Protein backbone atom coordinates (compact mmCIF):
# COMPACT_ATOMS: atom_id res chain seq x y z
CA UNK A 1 0.00 0.00 0.00
CA UNK A 2 1.31 3.42 -0.91
CA UNK A 3 2.04 5.54 2.15
CA UNK A 4 0.48 9.01 1.99
CA UNK A 5 3.00 11.84 1.80
CA UNK A 6 1.81 13.25 5.12
CA UNK A 7 2.52 9.95 6.88
CA UNK A 8 5.95 9.54 5.32
CA UNK A 9 7.24 12.57 7.20
CA UNK A 10 7.23 10.45 10.37
CA UNK A 11 8.72 7.23 8.98
CA UNK A 12 12.29 8.41 9.72
CA UNK A 13 13.05 10.13 13.03
CA UNK A 14 16.36 11.92 13.58
CA UNK A 15 17.66 13.17 16.90
CA UNK A 16 20.63 15.15 15.60
CA UNK A 17 19.69 18.81 15.49
CA UNK A 18 16.29 18.16 17.06
CA UNK A 19 15.18 20.10 20.17
CA UNK A 20 16.21 18.32 23.36
CA UNK A 21 12.66 17.39 24.31
CA UNK A 22 12.01 15.84 20.89
CA UNK A 23 15.30 13.94 20.92
CA UNK A 24 14.55 12.54 24.37
CA UNK A 25 11.05 11.52 23.27
CA UNK A 26 12.50 9.62 20.29
CA UNK A 27 15.05 7.90 22.52
CA UNK A 28 12.32 6.89 24.99
CA UNK A 29 10.26 5.40 22.17
CA UNK A 30 13.29 3.46 20.95
CA UNK A 31 13.97 2.14 24.45
CA UNK A 32 10.34 1.05 24.70
CA UNK A 33 10.69 -0.88 21.46
CA UNK A 34 8.49 1.40 19.39
CA UNK A 35 11.33 2.51 17.09
CA UNK A 36 14.26 0.76 15.42
CA UNK A 37 17.67 2.43 15.55
CA UNK A 38 19.48 1.98 12.21
CA UNK A 39 22.39 4.37 12.81
CA UNK A 40 23.52 6.87 15.40
CA UNK A 41 20.66 9.30 15.86
CA UNK A 42 18.49 7.73 13.12
CA UNK A 43 15.37 5.69 13.90
CA UNK A 44 12.59 4.05 11.91
CA UNK A 45 8.99 3.56 13.00
CA UNK A 46 9.00 0.15 11.32
CA UNK A 47 10.19 -3.34 12.26
CA UNK A 48 9.74 -5.32 9.06
CA UNK A 49 13.17 -5.63 7.33
CA UNK A 50 11.83 -5.29 3.78
CA UNK A 51 9.75 -2.27 4.67
CA UNK A 52 12.79 -0.75 6.40
CA UNK A 53 14.75 -1.11 3.16
CA UNK A 54 12.03 0.66 1.21
CA UNK A 55 11.88 3.49 3.75
CA UNK A 56 15.65 4.01 3.71
CA UNK A 57 15.74 4.03 -0.08
CA UNK A 58 13.03 6.72 -0.09
CA UNK A 59 14.90 8.82 2.47
CA UNK A 60 18.57 8.02 1.85
CA UNK A 61 19.59 11.59 1.03
CA UNK A 62 18.11 12.96 4.24
CA UNK A 63 19.66 10.14 6.29
CA UNK A 64 23.15 10.35 4.79
CA UNK A 65 23.13 14.14 5.00
CA UNK A 66 22.84 13.68 8.77
CA UNK A 67 25.40 10.88 9.02
CA UNK A 68 27.98 12.39 6.63
CA UNK A 69 27.41 16.16 6.45
CA UNK A 70 29.36 17.85 3.69
CA UNK A 71 29.66 14.70 1.58
CA UNK A 72 29.41 14.71 -2.21
CA UNK A 73 27.81 11.95 -4.29
CA UNK A 74 30.70 11.17 -6.61
CA UNK A 75 32.43 8.73 -8.97
CA UNK A 76 30.26 5.88 -10.28
CA UNK A 77 27.26 6.97 -8.20
CA UNK A 78 27.26 10.47 -9.69
CA UNK A 79 27.64 8.98 -13.18
CA UNK A 80 24.62 6.73 -12.55
CA UNK A 81 22.56 9.58 -11.14
CA UNK A 82 22.58 8.57 -7.47
CA UNK A 83 21.32 5.41 -5.83
CA UNK A 84 21.40 2.45 -8.21
CA UNK A 85 18.21 0.51 -8.87
CA UNK A 86 19.80 -2.75 -7.71
CA UNK A 87 20.58 -1.39 -4.26
CA UNK A 88 24.33 -1.33 -4.75
CA UNK A 89 26.81 0.88 -3.00
CA UNK A 90 26.69 4.65 -3.22
CA UNK A 91 30.04 6.44 -3.27
CA UNK A 92 30.48 9.61 -1.26
CA UNK A 93 33.55 11.84 -1.32
CA UNK A 94 34.61 13.60 1.86
CA UNK A 95 37.92 15.30 2.75
CA UNK A 96 38.15 14.01 6.34
CA UNK A 97 35.53 11.29 6.81
CA UNK A 98 36.54 8.41 4.54
CA UNK A 99 37.83 4.81 4.23
CA UNK A 100 34.73 3.39 5.86
CA UNK A 101 31.31 2.04 4.98
CA UNK A 102 27.89 2.79 6.42
CA UNK A 103 25.48 -0.12 6.13
CA UNK A 104 21.81 0.80 6.31
CA UNK A 105 18.78 -1.32 5.41
CA UNK A 106 18.82 -1.41 1.60
CA UNK A 107 21.71 1.05 1.19
CA UNK A 108 25.48 0.85 1.64
CA UNK A 109 27.41 4.13 1.61
CA UNK A 110 31.11 3.88 0.75
CA UNK A 111 33.10 6.89 1.92
CA UNK A 112 36.16 7.72 -0.17
CA UNK A 113 38.75 10.44 0.22
CA UNK A 114 38.03 13.42 -1.97
CA UNK A 115 37.19 17.11 -1.95
CA UNK A 116 34.04 18.37 -0.34
CA UNK A 117 31.65 20.50 -2.38
CA UNK A 118 33.29 22.45 -5.19
CA UNK A 119 32.14 25.07 -7.66
CA UNK A 120 29.40 23.61 -9.83
CA UNK A 121 28.34 20.84 -7.43
CA UNK A 122 24.61 20.78 -6.68
CA UNK A 123 23.28 21.08 -3.16
CA UNK A 124 20.22 19.08 -2.12
CA UNK A 125 17.83 21.71 -0.82
CA UNK A 126 18.83 22.85 2.67
CA UNK A 127 20.80 19.67 3.37
CA UNK A 128 24.58 19.81 3.76
CA UNK A 129 24.85 17.19 1.02
CA UNK A 130 25.87 17.53 -2.62
CA UNK A 131 25.94 15.97 -6.09
CA UNK A 132 29.11 16.21 -8.19
CA UNK A 133 29.06 18.48 -11.23
CA UNK A 134 29.36 16.93 -14.68
CA UNK A 135 33.03 17.97 -15.19
CA UNK A 136 33.89 16.58 -11.76
CA UNK A 137 32.06 13.33 -12.51
CA UNK A 138 33.98 12.82 -15.72
CA UNK A 139 37.34 13.38 -14.04
CA UNK A 140 36.56 11.12 -11.09
CA UNK A 141 35.37 8.31 -13.31
CA UNK A 142 38.69 8.28 -15.14
CA UNK A 143 40.56 7.62 -11.90
CA UNK A 144 41.80 4.13 -11.06
CA UNK A 145 39.05 1.63 -10.26
CA UNK A 146 39.41 -1.72 -8.55
CA UNK A 147 37.20 -4.47 -9.88
CA UNK A 148 34.11 -4.36 -12.10
CA UNK A 149 32.15 -2.53 -9.39
CA UNK A 150 34.89 -0.20 -8.22
CA UNK A 151 34.25 3.43 -7.42
CA UNK A 152 35.02 4.61 -10.98
CA UNK A 153 32.86 3.83 -13.99
CA UNK A 154 35.91 3.81 -16.28
CA UNK A 155 37.03 5.24 -19.61
CA UNK A 156 34.40 3.51 -21.74
CA UNK A 157 31.59 4.96 -19.62
CA UNK A 158 33.13 8.43 -19.87
CA UNK A 159 33.46 8.10 -23.65
CA UNK A 160 29.81 7.09 -23.89
CA UNK A 161 28.76 10.08 -21.80
CA UNK A 162 30.81 12.46 -23.95
CA UNK A 163 29.12 11.13 -27.09
CA UNK A 164 25.71 11.66 -25.47
CA UNK A 165 26.64 15.23 -24.52
CA UNK A 166 27.91 15.92 -28.04
CA UNK A 167 24.73 14.61 -29.63
CA UNK A 168 22.48 16.51 -27.23
CA UNK A 169 24.33 19.80 -26.80
CA UNK A 170 27.07 20.08 -29.41
CA UNK A 171 30.80 20.79 -29.38
CA UNK A 172 30.53 24.05 -27.46
CA UNK A 173 29.23 22.19 -24.41
CA UNK A 174 32.13 19.74 -24.58
CA UNK A 175 34.55 22.65 -24.75
CA UNK A 176 32.89 24.26 -21.73
CA UNK A 177 33.20 21.00 -19.82
CA UNK A 178 36.87 20.75 -20.76
CA UNK A 179 37.58 24.31 -19.59
CA UNK A 180 35.89 23.71 -16.24
CA UNK A 181 37.51 20.30 -15.80
CA UNK A 182 40.94 21.81 -16.44
CA UNK A 183 40.56 24.10 -13.42
CA UNK A 184 39.00 21.43 -11.22
CA UNK A 185 41.79 18.98 -12.03
CA UNK A 186 44.38 21.33 -10.57
CA UNK A 187 42.72 21.54 -7.16
CA UNK A 188 41.65 17.88 -7.14
CA UNK A 189 45.05 16.51 -8.07
CA UNK A 190 43.61 14.81 -11.15
CA UNK A 191 45.93 16.17 -13.84
CA UNK A 192 46.46 12.75 -15.43
CA UNK A 193 42.72 12.20 -15.55
CA UNK A 194 42.31 15.58 -17.24
CA UNK A 195 44.85 14.61 -19.87
CA UNK A 196 42.74 11.55 -20.66
CA UNK A 197 39.56 13.63 -20.78
CA UNK A 198 41.20 16.27 -22.95
CA UNK A 199 42.31 13.59 -25.38
CA UNK A 200 38.83 12.09 -25.56
CA UNK A 201 37.19 15.45 -26.24
CA UNK A 202 39.82 16.39 -28.77
CA UNK A 203 39.56 13.06 -30.58
Regions of interest found by a model, annotated:
Residues 2-133:
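Short gly/ser-rich loop at a beta-strand->alpha-helix junction or flexible surface loop bordering the NTP-binding
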Residues 16, 24, 116-203:
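Hydrophobic alpha-helical interaction segments
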Amino acid sequence: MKIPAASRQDEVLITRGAPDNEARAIQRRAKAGELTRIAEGVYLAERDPETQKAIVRRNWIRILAVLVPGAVISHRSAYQGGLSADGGSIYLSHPTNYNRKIDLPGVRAVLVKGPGPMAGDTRFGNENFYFASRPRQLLENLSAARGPRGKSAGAKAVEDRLVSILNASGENELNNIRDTARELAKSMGLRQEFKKLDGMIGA
